[in-house]
Every structure is written in C-alpha cells, then in structure tokens.
Amino acid sequence: MWSSDRLAGAGSGGAVVTVAFTNARDCFLHLPRRLVAQLHLLQNQAIEVASDHQPTYLSWVEGRHFNDQSENVAEINRQVGQKLGLSSGDQVFLRPCSHVVSCQQVEVEPLSADDWEILELHAISLEQHLLDQIRIVFPKAVVPIWVDQQTYIFIQIVTLMPAAPYGRLETNTKLLIQPKTRQAKESTFPKEGDAHGQVHSYGREQKGLSKELQTRQLHTNSEGITASNGRDPKVPGGPLKPSWWAVLGSMLSFGPDSKQESAWGSLELGAFKNMQSQAAPLEGTFRVCQVQPPSARTTTATSVFHKHCTAHVFPWDQEYFDVEPSFTVTYGKLVKLHSPKQQQDKSKQGVLLPDKEKQLSKSPDHKQISSNRSEEAAEACVLKVVWNGLEELKNATEFTESLELLHRGKVWIPDDLRKRLNIEMHAVVRITPLETTPKIPRSLKLQPRENLPKDVNEETIKTVFSSWVQQSATTMLPLVISKEERIKLEIKDGLREFSLSTVHSQEKEKEEGKTVFVLSSILLQKISVQVLLEPMIKEEQSAEIDFLLPSLTLSSLGGVSALGASAMEHITHSLLGRPLSRQLMALVAGLRNGALLITGGKGSGKSTFAKAICKEAQDTLDARVETVDCKALRGKRLESIQKALEVAFSEAAWRQPSVILLDDLDLIAGLPSVPEQEHSPEAVQSQRLAHALNDMIKEFVSTGSLVALIATSQLQQSLHPSLVSAQGIHTFQCVQHLQPPNPEQRCEILHSVVKNKLGCDISNFPDLDLQCIAKDTEAFVARDFTVLVDRAIHSSLSRQHSSSREDLTLTTSDFQKALRGFLPASLRNVNLHKPRDLGWDKIGGLHEVRQILMDTIQLPAKYPELFANLPIRQRTGILLYGPPGTGKTLLAGVVARESGMNFISIKGPELLSKYIGASEQAVRDVFIRAQAAKPCILFFDEFESIAPRRGHDNTGVTDRVVNQLLTQLDGVEGLQGVYVLAATSRPDLIDPALLRPGRLDKCVYCPPPDQVSRLEILTVLSKSLALADDVDLQHVASVTDSFTGADLKALLYNAQLEALQGRLLPSGLPDGGSSSDSDLSLSSMVFLNHSSGSDDSAGDGECGLEQSLLSLEMSEILPDESKFNMYRLYFGSSYESELGNGTPSDLSSHCLSAPSSVTQDLPAAPGKDPLFTQHPVFRTPSQEGCQDLTQEQRDQLRAEISIIKGRYRSQSGEDESLNQPGPIKTTFAISQAHLMTALAHTRPSISEDEGKEFAELYENFQNPKKRKNQSGTVFRTGQKVTLA
C-alpha cells in the first residue's frame, strides 16, 4: 500500500497510525509519546506521511492529552488533512526523514484574491506567528495559515530554494509571495525572471500594492536588509522599510523612473538591464580560494574582467572545465560572512549578538550558520561576477546538500580587492544579484592615496584614468562602481592607488539602498573629472590577513619522499581532491579515510614533516590549515584546552575543505609515563581530553565535513587508548613513522639542509663529500643535521676569517671538525655504557669464541655495505653461556669496543616491575633506546633471570617479558643495526623459544680454561704487574686446575697484596707482620697535638723517635691540598679529626710544631732546620690514652715513612736518591713465593663437584637428544612443568 522507496532521504523505521482530525490551529502532526520514542524522532525532524495519495511531509509535536495506553493515533487539523486528501479514520504509514534541508528561500502564492487581501492586512501578525504554525513545507502543498483566532487563509508552496523534495523553514528563510489580484487578465506575466523564479506583475492595482511590497523577515530583532530583494523605491508611498517578509513584486523590472534618464547613457543602462535579465545568477555563499579559474587565467578574459572589481565564481569540480571555458558576466554585491572565531572576537570587543543568533552560532547545523544574515559585514562591495560553468553550479546544488556543505562553490577575488575588503583567504562570502538601477554620475573626483612624483600633473592623471576606463569597460559591458572606490593607475612605471568618488545631481533623495553608478569610455567624455594632487591621509598599514605557513615543502625536505607521497595520498582522498574520490566517497561521512598520525622520536622532524604536508595540501588542494600547538596548551586548565580545540574545529568546518594539525598531541592526551601516575590529575585530564576529542571527531563524521586531521606523537602507544583503540571509532587509520634515516636518506637530508640554509646548490662546494659525512652520522636525526650544518658553517667562517656567507665554502673537513664532541639528540637520554679500554689482546684463551664474535658482529659493523650484498640473513643474536668467571661479560665489552658500536648493558632484574605492563614497557623502551643508538650492542647479563621458561612464574610477569622479548627479537619490523648479546650460566633455564632461529640463534660455549689458556690468561693479566725474575707462570698454570679466568685474576691480586705486606712489615714480626692481627695498623697511628692535654704529649727521650727518622721537609710531609689525600690514605681519616679538620697549614702547626728551646740538626738531612721537638706517641684501637713505642715499632714506622717519601717524590718528580735509592716499584715485585703463598690461601670459585655438574648440564644442553634418552625424571605431586 505504501512504497518504502519513495524518498531516498527517509529513515528505515516506521509505524502505521490512524488519522484523527482536531481543531488545532497549526499544521503539525500531533503524536503520542510512546510513538515518538518508537520512531526515535528528533526535534524539528520531518515525517513522511504515506497513504494512497502522493506522500506528504509534515512536522510533528508531542500531543499532551495522550496517555501511555493510547493506540497509534496521529491527530491533525481538519483543514490540513482535507487539503492533503485524508479523512478521519484513515490509516497512514509514518516514516521519519533522516535529512532535512534548511530552506533559504520559499516562494508561495495565495490560493485566492481574498487570501491575498487578508494577507496584506495581517502581514505583521503573520511574521510573528508563522513558525508557530508550520515548519515543514514541500512543493505544491496547500496549507492553511491562521491570521487570528477565527480567520485563516490558504497558501500554496510554489518552489523551494535550494531545490529539495521538502524543507524546513528557519528564522532566516526568505518568503517570496506572489500577489493575487482580482483583475481578470492579471496572469499575463513576462517570461523574464531571476534565479529564484521571481515574476513580474503589471496591472491597474500594482502601484496600490507597492506600499506592501516590503522586505520583511521572520525575526523582528534583526537589522539586516536582504540585498536580493531591494528595488527602486521611486514609487508612491515612500521608501522601503526593513523587515523579514519578502513580497514578490517587480524585482527585476527596471521600470521607468519618475524622472527618466535622458538618452545620454541609455546604451550602457540598456546593456546592464539586458545582462541582468538574460543571466540567472545564483545567490548563495561561496568559499574564497587562491586558485585562479579559467576566466581569470585566459588572456582575453583578463583584459576585460581582471582590471577592476571582479569576482570569479566556479563550481567545486573545476577539473571538468573545457580548455576554452564559457562564462557568464553579471553584476552583484559581495559581502563577507564572519567565521565563528571572528564572531567570538567581535563579541569580546563589546559587540553582542542577539540571543537567538548566539544560539545559531553554536548550533552544529552549518546551514543555519551560513545563512545567518547577522554575520554579514556592514559594507558590501559592488562588482562584476564572472560565473564559470553556470550549469554546473546549478547542478551542484543537490550534491552540496547531500554533503551538508556550507558553500555552493568557489570564488576567486583579486588580491588587491580582497585585501581592501579585509577578506582573508578561505573566507566565506555571500554574493547576491544587483537589482537596483545604476545611475549616471555627473562628475568624478580622483585623489591619490600616496605621494606622487613631482612632475605628475592633472592632465597626466586624466589621461591615464581615461586609458584605464577604456581597458576596463566597454559600452556593452560597462563598469559599475559604487560611490567610493579604490583604483590603481600606472603612473611613471609604477602602480599608484587612487580614490575615485562619484557625484550625482539628485543627491536630495535619501535612499536606503546603496547607490551604484555605471561608467564607460563614452560616458567619460561627458563627465567632468576633478583631480586633486594632494594625497589623502594614509591609513595605517593593516596587518597580514592571510595565514602563512612555513615555506618548507615536501620537495625541500630530504629523505621523506616515500612517506610524503603516502601521506599526501591519504589527505587527498580525505578531502575528495580527485574525481575518483568524489565518485566513490561522496556519500560517505566525514573524515573519510580517518586521521593521519605521524610518529617519531625527538628531533626526527615530525612537526616539520606535518607542516610540509599541510603546505602541500594548501597549495594543491586549496585547503585551509588550522594548527594547534599542544605543547603551548600543556599545563593549562581543561576548559581552556577544550575551548582551543573547539575553536580550531569550528574554524576548519567553516572554511572547509580544511586540515587540522594537532602538533605533539601526546602532551595533552597521552598516557602517563609510569604506572604510578595512572590516577594523577594530569592522567585524568588527558583521559577527559581524549574523550572530548573523540566527541568532536564524531560530530564531524556525522555532519560530513570536508576536514582532514593530522596529529603528531612520539609513539602510537603514547596516546590515550581511546584514540588508538581498535574498537569504537577508528580515529587514526593511517600511521606514518619516521624511522632513523639510512645512509642514503642522511645524504639527502644533508643536501636539503645545506640548500635551505645557504640558498645555493651543493655543486658549488666541490670539496664536500656528503656520502662520507653520512657514514659518520649514524643515529643522527633531522634536528642533529640542522645543528651540524650550523656548526660546519661556523667552522668554515672561522677558517676563512670571514663573516659573509656569500664567500662561504664548505668542505668535508669543516663537517669533521663539527662532528668532534657532538652528541646526537637520540643518544643524549640513552644510558650508554662505555666499555673498558680493552682489546682482543687483553683476553687470554677463548680463541674460537673470539673468532665467532668477530665474524658475527665486528666484521659486519666495519664493512656494512659488503655484508649487505650477501644473499644470506645476518645473525643479530648470540647467547654466551658457560660457568661463572669464564669471561662472558668481558667478551661483550671487548667486542663493542673493537667494533666501535654503542654499548647498552642490561642487568636482568632491573627490567622487572610489580606493576602490570611495566615490565613489558621496560623491554620495549630498552629496544627503542638501542634502535636510537644504532649501531648498537644490547647486552643482557644474567639472562636467565628475565627470560625463564614460561609457566613457572605464579605472577606471570616473566611470561609476559618473554613474550615481549620474542616480539622484539623476531618481530615484523626486525632489528636493524642492533646486535643482541646475552650471557648466562644456566642456559637450561632460558625459555627454548628464545633460542630458536631468528632470535638468539647462535649459542656460544665459553669453557673453563685449560692449562694453555690459563697460561695465556696469566700472561695477559700480569703485563701490568711487576714480576720478579723467579716467577714461573707455566708452573702456576699447571697447579691451578679448575681455576677460571676470574680466579686467576684474584690469585694475582692476592699475590700483589702479599708482596705489599712483605715489603711493609719486617720479617721478624709474628705471622709475617700481618697487620690484621697486630696493633701496628697504619690507620691507627696518629700524631697528637702538644696541647691536647695528655700527660704524655711531651714524652722523654726514651719514648722519642730518632731525629733522623723525621728528616723531612714540611713540603715533603704535608703537600698541598690537591695531593693531601695520599697522606690521609696512610694515616686514616681519624688523623684530621684528631686535629680538628684543619687546613694543611693548620695541621703543620699542630702536628709538627716544637718549642724554640730545642734546636738540633737532623742527621738524615744536614743543614735543615729541626721540625720536631716532641716525639710521636702511639695509641692502639683497643687502648685509651697513649703508649710509648718500642724499638721494633720505631723500625717499622721508619720503613713506612720511607715508603711515603718515595711515593710522594715519584709522583712529584723529585729526586728519589736522597733517602731511597733505586726505583720504588722494585720494592713491590711479585715473586714466585708470593704467588705460591697466595695460591695456598686461594681456592677456585667452582668446586670439582660443581664443575662436573656444569659440564653435564652443558653437555645435555648441547645434545638435547641425549638428554631425552636418559631415564625419565620423577615428578612429585603439584610440581609445575612446561612443554617448551
């Protein structure tokens, strides 16, 4: 009975209801609340009423007297129902319409002459209450309108603009009413009409009706006058009054004036009228673009239309133009519409909008925003309008309505005119037809707006002006100007700006509309031109109105050509920049391809790359760019950040197609850096901002806006999960990651940076080898190259002793000098470990292991190009296993130093954390650090602690760590320039999945050293020690079975201590002079102050030392502060505390002062002044007070002081022959006895039983089949096992 496919815009749901007639004085459909909920109806939504007749469309309201148990009954006014062909009790099908067009203009006709007369009498009442009676209209509908409580009239809907099956009346909709007179032959209308279907009526009563031909609007608070409904007010009854009601009269009948113009100027006026009558210009809003249309690019068109005030209008699909396009020229008025941000700035300055207009400015319905007359600027410009592709503009109406676009097409305005009118690029303007009859000026006045050359006179200016008029206007296409114009004339090979003023003889008439004048070369001959040579007062230079982006484009950046092409492809499809995109995605919602996310490390060039994409989109797609610097918003209140984002999104929607750039989005909508901050205020604010951003994007998707979104972030995972989640709205569907550049890309970046900074080609520097520099700049990013080039330029200027860049010559040596001491940004926050200054010659034994490491790591690092051509996959992971102390960690450091790569050492437990996800994040961060520092060696020590077999951990932490390691070691991306080394003594505990090919695929066994290897180890370790002639390392190697490399090193350390103790203490002391068992510890000896209060402070001669023992100068005993730490090493930290922590000079006065009565020469240093008059005393740690020294103690102390003297003199370079003959190091030579003594007290770290266990364990690890053939293991109840 009812067709479900009658309207493409109808919704899918519906309901069958019974019609009931009421006496309600409106045209609404009254529905019960239950039915409203069932149909999911929205306010002001249209409803299709389908019956046996043609479907109709009505607006609805909720009936107040319905109860919840009411049946499906829809009530409607009796007169409305009868006109729609319905009867009470009929069943109809209701279906909600998903898309309702806001009407800009509606043409209606009273059904009879009586209705027209009643309408004239109640015009004011109708303009106040019309929207309370009807909201949804459709062509050919006949509806009743109540003018009071008892009286109603019928009107018929003729046409809607824009053309649609149905539409909604708004507060700013123009309503054009055709008069209905009683004259029998009143239907004789001419064929001419404008684009809105306006017709002309001639009759006896036309002048009588002119009093009511007033331009009214549906809202009485507005002060605007619709420019499209103006007419010549020279009719009886006075001037037109502004209101919101548009009565259709003789809009385009430029009828005879009360005082007609003479024959002078009749050709120009006739051409103007003919042009306006033949063309059917479209009234609407257009977007200002920067690309010239074909009418402005062609030579012939430019000569006629491009000389003065001319606007070129063309449809969105300008690619469909022919080689020689056709265009139509009319005259019109252009006025700028304020954007939401400009309205907000205007309101801040004190200009308050009416309440309802504020609501419209906040409404998401862009149609209401675009047609809001209060947003128009007060000053309109009269100009020529060149319509390119007029038929395409008419046909584009349906396309633009389906996408809910703000603008019907594009308009190009010359820069001079655009800046004079203060219209920025990508602004929105309204163009309306010029319907007033132009006047003939009686005189013209020219006055320069700037100083003219002294030799310029009035006749010169008149001649130039006459030539300008002849080029800009013809008789058939006259020049239309307003009362005040600005023109540019060529004076003395330069353009000078003049002010052109017109004077009309009939100035006594006060006209509401703006008077325009017609001008041509013929008329100029009869018009007096007055020239004033005195310049006008120059206005202040206005600020730049256009938003300027950085000049860097994608072509000027190096190393990102592939990423740039992919990103631009995405943005082009998102903004429907190609015909195929328009055909495939025209009916898809906004953000068609999703947003673009650009990620990369610090200094990788994310912001520069994103701005270059925006620049490319602005140049090629004519897109508006709105940039939001999230770094500047960081730390501000949530409301301020949301407001900044809303302003950017609203501006982008107003000026669409647009691109929004959210730079450093992770700073305001990111994840906390550590799990402890998940509930911090910053994390809560980031979560709320992420949800708010999602809501804004959903709104753009629902409205179908032509807006593309670009965001930058360090990592995709650093954004809030709601923005990158796979569920819900897919915000970022394209992710471009800026990887560290390879050598070829580094060369391109260097080339582009040098070219951008110096403005010259790289061929001007023959001594500059960029490929050589690129090889030395591993791990450099874009910012590093910028700084490096600056340093190289500084080095070159310093070398040439010049400050001028014109004579600058860059060479490879300048860059090499700039690289010295320069640390790239990627390595500044990376905790790199500098390996010890060791080489392969410092390692004894392990020849096979060393060769494997050289072939796997060192050679590929030194010759990367050679190994890159090999047809095999290079190994990047090696596991070193063996007993403790066999040199696994030492090998990792040596191979890092020999290969010249960066070295990152990780101890296993430092990656583990109690927070869920923190351990996996720590693993990811380690590999990110390694990638940033590549070429790099990533060394995991104690690998079994972080990668045990899965299934043995109750918490599951290590299981997740193993899974993360598997992903990082052999993921989809793979490791480039990162070698992974792992060391363990228990390879059987490591998860076997990590040891499979592609991960740690090479397991290298580091065995305990045999006798030959032990001899090599002893030889290498003893190179830095002083060995006596009797040392036999071969014998030591033979008697140190089961010793590892670490044990042999400890053995040599112990032997060195034995030699030191044997030299310090006499052989006659008990236990070999062991300082640990004797009270003769050097650290316990102090020199007491003579004024310390002790009774023994001035001991007698028996307790004193021999004077020859202390025959040292003051400079020898107490050196300066920089070398005083050596003295504290022997006398302990208590030495200063006993003396009050004094300075060296104070110490000398306290420790070595003596009464003047004692003056004796020291035999050991004849000729020296005495330094001591009191004898040192000795205090043991277990005793209180002081104790006299024995002869043996004096001898020991004498030997120790001799050693101190020798060490100090050897360090200070003094002659050591005074008190100690021979070199000092001979006293510390390690003898065979020392080695044997140390060997007696040293045992291997791995016992014999433990060695057998390790050997069996490693044998089973190397031969898994042998382990399987062994007897089965007995498992106890509850024991956890793994199948790995």
Swiss-Prot record:
Q: What class of enzyme is it?
A: hydrolase
Q: Where is this region: Disordered?
A: 339-373, 1261-1284
One GO cellular component this record assigns the protein to is: peroxisomal membrane
- GO terms classed as biological process: microtubule-based peroxisome localization; protein import into peroxisome matrix, receptor recycling; protein targeting to peroxisome; protein unfolding
Q: Could you name the domain of life of the organism this protein comes from? A: Eukaryota
Positions binding ATP in this chain are 600-607, 882-889
Q: What is the protein name stated in its UniProt record?
A: Peroxisomal ATPase PEX1
Q: Which organism is it from?
A: Mus musculus
The gene name on file is Pex1
